[in-house]
C-alpha cells in the first residue's frame, strides 16, 4: 500500500502544504471558538419547551434504522456535521431579543452611538449600528433549535399509518411516545404495529365499452393484479397506468385515468379482499354549457401541420409559405427553411393512422434532439364536423441560426504554470437545411515557462447530422426512433514551449444512437490522429530527472572504463540530446559494461526506450465501440447508476496493408510510425440520495491497453494517475507505475485501476462539504524488458501497490 508523501512540487509557485496547514489551524481555531461560544445548544429554548434530538421508529417492537421511513417524519432534529449541529451553534451566537433598528441599538448602546456620531456623523453612527444588527441577523438566519411540536408528531403518526395501509396492513396502528429530559432536550418514539397483511382474493374486471373491450382483449397482455398477491397500492397504480397506456396507444385519444376505478373491501376479518376493476365506457364532455356522457371512440390523425418558425409575437399572423411532403404540411410565416424530407423523419405520427400516445412523445423528443429549436409544442384538436378525426399542429420555435460562444479560464497545475486559456466558437444551425449543426471553434492558451512564454493554438470544425450518413443502405440498420446521429470532425493544434511542442491533426467520423432512454451506443468508424513532436531537443529539459539519472550512469561508465569524456553530459541545448543519445547507444553496445554494471546498463536502456517512445511521431487510426447505461432521469437526480464500456483498436487495417518498417523495426504508414494496440475501458458510478441533501457516491474504473506487432503505446494514449478527478492525494502523472517511486516528471502505464467513495453533504447554508477516499494505481502489462519488475502487474498480489 502506498501513502501520499505530501511533498510540495518543486515546480509550484506556492508552498501549498504550508497553506493547507495554516488553513487547517484557522479552521480548528474557528471551530473551537464556535463550540466554546455556543456549547449550550438549548440556550434559546424556553423553560416550557424541549428541543428534539432524536427520532426512533420501532416496527413490531424492533427498532428500524432504514431511511425509507424518514420522508414521512415531519419534524427532524437539527442537521449535524461530524455529529455537531454547526448551524444551531451559529444561530445561538445571535440573539432574537437584540435591537432590530438603529434607533433601538442607539438606546441600548448610547455611549458607542454618541462616540461614532461625534467623531464622524449621524450617517456613520447609523451604519455602525446596522453592522451589528446585520451581523446578528446573519447568525439568526441559520436553523434554530427544533422545538417539540405535538401537532407535527400526530401528523407524522398519521403519515406512517397511511403508508402501511398502502402496503396492505389495514389493521395496523401507530403509537407515539415523547421522552422529555431535564436539560430541555427530548426524543420521540414511533411504535408501529403492522399485524397481518391483506391478500387479493377474487378479481373482477368490467369494461363498459365494446370498443375498449375489443382493444383490451386483442392486446393479449396480463393484468398485474393477481389473486393471492399481497395488497399494495403501487401495484394498483401500475395496473391503472398499464391500462391507460394501452388505450392511449390504440387510438383512444380522450381516455384518462379518471375512467378507471378500483373497489376493495378492507373490512373483512380474514385479511383478504375482493377487487372490482371498472373501466368506464364514457367520458364527460362539455357541450353548450352542460356536461354530457360521450362514448369513447377510436381516433385517427387526418391532418398534420408543422409551423417551422413559430413565435409568440407572430401568433395570429398569416402563414405565407407552405410545403407538403407525404401528407404533412410544413408552414412558415416567412419561408420554410427546413428540407421537409428530413424534418418529416422526426414526425412519427402519420396522416390517416390511428392516434398513438407513444408516437406523440417520440415526435416531441426527436424534435428536441435536433438542437435546432428552443421549444416544441404539439397540440391536437378534433376536426369540426367529425367526432373521431384529429388535427395535429406542431409549433417549432427555432434557435438563432448563428450563435457565438466564448469561454475563458485561468489554469494552474504541476504540468503547466499559471496561465490563461480561451475558446471561441461559432455555430451554424440548419447549415444545409437538414437540421445539421455546423460548429467552428478556435482555442488558445498562454502562460510563462522556464523556456519563455508558452502558447497553444488550435482550430476544430465539426458537422453533426441528425441521421446516419452511410453507403450501401447501412443507414437503415438503426431505426430513426433511436435518434441516430452522425458526427464528422477535423481539427489541428500547435504548441510552443509546451512539452515537445506537439503538433496534432485529428479526423473523426462516428455514429451514435440511443437504444432506449437509458442505453446509448457509439461507434467510432474513423478516429484518426497524427501526432508530430517539433522540439525533441527539449526532451531532457522537460524530463530533467532522466538527464540526472543518465549523468549518474555516465559517471559510473567513465569510472569503469577509466576515462572522463562522458561525465558530466553537456547542458548545452543544441548538443544535449545528440550527446546523450550517442552515449546511450555506446552503453547499449558495450557487453563488458553490461556484465559488470547491469543496473546502470539497464537504466541507460530504459531511458533510451522512453526517449524513443515519447519523442516518436505517431499515426493513430482508431476503430472503437462504446456502450453507455445511465438511468439518471433528470439533472438533479441523485439516485442513479452509470456504466460505460469502450473497446478500441488502433492500426489493425493499416497494419495489414502496410509492409514498411523503420530503423527500430516498428511498422510505418507513409513513413510515420503506426500505433497498433487494443484498449478497453470500464467505468461504473453509483449514487445514493441519503436524505437531508446528502449524497453517497461510488466510482470504479478499470482500463487496459495492449500493443501488438512490435508497436509502442503512444504517450497520449497511456494511462496516468493523480489529479483532481483521479487519486486526489497525488498530482497528475506523479503516481506509479506499481510500487515504484521513480521521481520522474511523467509516469504512465498500460493498466489502470481506480476506485473511490465519496460522501457529499451540506455544512451550513450553501457551503458544501465532502469526505472521500481514493484508491488505485497504474501498472505495466506489456511485458517489456525495459520495465522494472516493481512497475509490472504480475498477479493479484500487485494490488498491494494500490495507493490510498
Kindly give the residue locations of the regions a language model identified.
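Interaction-mediating elements
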Residues: 40-369, 478, 496
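Flexible glycine-/small-residue-rich
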Residues: 61, 192-196, 207-209, 277-283, ...
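Transmembrane beta-strand segments of outer-membrane beta-barrel domains in Gram-negative
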Residues: 249, 454-456, 460-697
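Bacterial Sec-dependent N-terminal signal peptides
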Residues: 1-51, 163, 700
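Transmembrane beta-strands of outer-membrane beta-barrel proteins
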Residues: 215-218, 258, 379, 395, ...
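Intrinsically disordered, low-complexity acidic Ser/Thr-rich regulatory segments
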Residues: 117-149, 322-340, 580-622, 668-673, ...
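Outer-membrane beta-barrel initiation region
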Residues: 289-480, 599-600, 609-639
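C-terminal transmembrane beta-barrel domains of outer membrane proteins
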Residues: 40-43, 346, 419-427, 433-466, ...
Amino acid at each position: 500500500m502506498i501513502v501520499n508523501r505530501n511533498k510540495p512540487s518543486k515546480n509550484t509557485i506556492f508552498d501549498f502544504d504550508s497553506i493547507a496547514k495554516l488553513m487547517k489551524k484557522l479552521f480548528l481555531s474557528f471551530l473551537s471558538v464556535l463550540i466554546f461560544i455556543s456549547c449550550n445548544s438549548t440556550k434559546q429554548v424556553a423553560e416550557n419547551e424541549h428541543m428534539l434530538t432524536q427520532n426512533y421508529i420501532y416496527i413490531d417492537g424492533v427498532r428500524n434504522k432504514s431511511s425509507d421511513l424518514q420522508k414521512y417524519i415531519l419534524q427532524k432534529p437539527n442537521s449535524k456535521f461530524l455529529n455537531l449541529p454547526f448551524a444551531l451553534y451559529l444561530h445561538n451566537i445571535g440573539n432574537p431579543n437584540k435591537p432590530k433598528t438603529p434607533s433601538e441599538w442607539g438606546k441600548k448602546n448610547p455611549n458607542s452611538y454618541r462616540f461614532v456620531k461625534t467623531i464622524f456623523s449621524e450617517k456613520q453612527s447609523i451604519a455602525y449600528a446596522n453592522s451589528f444588527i446585520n451581523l446578528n441577523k446573519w447568525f439568526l438566519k441559520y436553523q434554530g433549535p427544533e422545538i417539540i411540536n405535538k401537532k407535527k408528531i400526530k401528523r407524522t403518526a398519521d403519515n406512517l399509518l397511511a403508508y402501511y395501509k398502502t402496503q396492505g396492513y389495514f389493521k395496523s396502528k401507530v403509537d407515539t411516545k415523547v421522552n422529555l429530559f431535564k436539560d430541555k432536550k427530548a426524543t420521540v418514539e414511533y411504535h408501529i404495529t403492522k399485524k397481518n397483511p391483506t391478500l387479493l382474493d377474487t378479481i373482477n374486471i368490467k369494461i363498459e365499452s365494446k370498443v375498449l373491450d375489443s382493444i383490451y382483449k386483442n392486446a393479449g397482455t396480463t393484468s398485474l393484479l393477481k389473486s393471492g398477491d399481497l395488497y399494495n397500492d403501487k401495484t394498483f397504480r401500475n395496473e391503472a397506468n398499464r391500462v391507460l397506456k394501452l388505450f392511449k396507444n390504440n387510438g383512444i385519444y380522450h381516455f384518462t385515468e379518471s375512467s378507471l376505478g378500483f373497489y376493495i373491501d378492507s373490512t373483512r376479518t380474514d385479511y383478504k379482499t375482493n377487487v372490482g376493476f371498472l373501466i368506464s365506457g364514457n367520458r364527460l364532455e362539455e357541450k353548450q354549457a352542460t356536461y354530457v356522457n360521450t362514448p369513447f371512440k377510436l381516433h385517427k390523425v387526418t391532418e398534420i401541420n408543422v409551423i417551422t418558425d413559430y413565435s409568440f409575437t407572430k401568433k395570429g399572423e398569416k402563414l405565407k409559405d407552405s410545403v407538403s411532403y407525404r401528407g404533412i404540411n410544413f408552414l412558415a410565416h416567412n419561408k420554410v427553411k427546413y428540407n421537409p424530407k428530413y424534418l418529416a423523419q422526426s414526425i412519427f405520427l402519420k396522416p390517416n393512422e390511428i392516434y398513438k400516445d407513444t408516437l406523440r412523445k417520440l415526435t416531441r423528443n426527436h424534435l428536441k434532439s435536433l438542437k435546432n429549436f428552443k421549444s416544441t409544442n404539439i397540440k391536437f384538436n378534433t376536426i369540426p364536423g367529425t367526432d373521431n378525426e384529429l388535427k395535429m399542429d406542431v409549433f417549432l420555435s427555432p434557435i438563432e441560426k448563428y450563435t457565438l460562444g466564448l469561454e475563458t479560464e485561468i489554469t494552474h497545475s504541476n504540468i503547466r504554470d499559471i496561465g490563461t486559456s480561451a475558446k471561441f466558437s461559432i455555430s451554424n444551425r440548419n447549415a444545409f437545411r437538414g437540421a445539421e449543426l455546423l460548429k467552428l471553434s478556435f482555442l488558445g492558451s498562454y502562460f510563462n515557462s522556464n523556456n519563455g512564454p508558452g502558447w497553444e493554438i488550435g482550430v476544430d470544425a465539426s458537422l453533426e447530422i441528425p441521421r446516419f450518413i452511410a453507403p450501401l443502405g447501412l443507414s437503415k440498420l438503426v431505426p430513426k426512433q433511436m435518434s441516430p446521429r452522425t458526427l464528422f470532425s477535423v481539427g489541428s493544434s500547435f504548441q510552443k514551449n509546451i512539452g515537445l511542442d506537439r503538433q496534432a491533426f485529428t479526423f473523426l467520423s462516428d455514429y451514435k444512437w440511443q437504444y432506449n432512454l437509458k442505453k446509448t451506443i457509439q461507434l467510432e468508424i474513423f478516429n484518426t490522429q497524427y501526432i508530430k513532436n517539433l522540439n525533441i531537443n527539449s526532451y531532457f529539459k522537460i524530463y530533467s530527472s532522466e538527464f540526472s539519472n543518465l549523468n549518474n550512469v555516465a559517471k559510473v561508465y567513465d569510472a569503469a572504463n577509466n576515462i572522463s569524456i562522458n561525465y558530466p553530459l553537456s547542458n548545452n541545448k543544441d548538443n544535449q540530446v545528440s550527446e546523450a543519445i550517442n552515449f546511450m547507444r555506446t552503453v547499449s553496445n558495450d557487453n563488458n559494461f553490461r556484465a559488470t554494471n547491469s543496473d546502470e546498463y539497464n537504466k541507460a536502456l530504459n531511458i533510451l526506450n522512453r526517449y524513443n517512445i515519447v519523442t516518436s511521431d505517431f499515426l493513430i487510426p482508431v476503430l472503437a465501440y462504446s456502450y453507455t447505461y445511465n438511468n439518471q432521469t433528470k439533472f438533479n437526480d441523485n439516485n442513479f447508476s452509470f456504466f460505460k464500456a469502450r473497446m478500441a483498436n488502433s492500426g489493425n487495417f493499416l497494419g495489414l496493408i502496410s509492409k514498411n518498417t523503420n530503423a527500430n523495426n516498428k511498422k510505418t504508414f507513409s513513413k510515420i510510425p503506426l500505433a497498433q494496440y487494443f484498449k478497453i475501458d470500464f467505468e461504473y458510478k453509483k449514487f445514493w440520495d441519503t436524505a437531508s441533501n446528502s449524497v453517497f457516491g461510488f466510482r470504479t474504473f478499470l482500463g487496459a491497453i495492449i500493443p501488438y506487432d512490435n508497436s509502442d503505446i503512444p504517450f497520449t494514449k497511456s494511462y496516468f494517475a493523480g489529479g483532481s478527478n483521479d487519486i486526489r492525494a497525488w498530482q497528475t502523472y506523479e503516481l506509479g507505475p506499481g510500487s515504484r517511486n521513480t521521481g520522474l516528471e511523467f509516469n504512465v502505464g498500460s493498466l489502470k485501476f481506480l476506485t473511490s467513495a465519496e460522501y457529499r453533504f451540506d455544512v451550513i447554508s450553501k457551503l458544501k462539504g465532502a469526505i472521500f477516499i481514493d484508491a488505485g494505481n497504474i501498472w505495466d502489462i506489456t511485458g517489456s524488458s525495459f520495465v522494472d519488475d516493481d512497475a509490472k502487474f504480475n498477479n493479484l498480489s500487485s494490488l498491494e501497490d494500490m495507493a490510498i
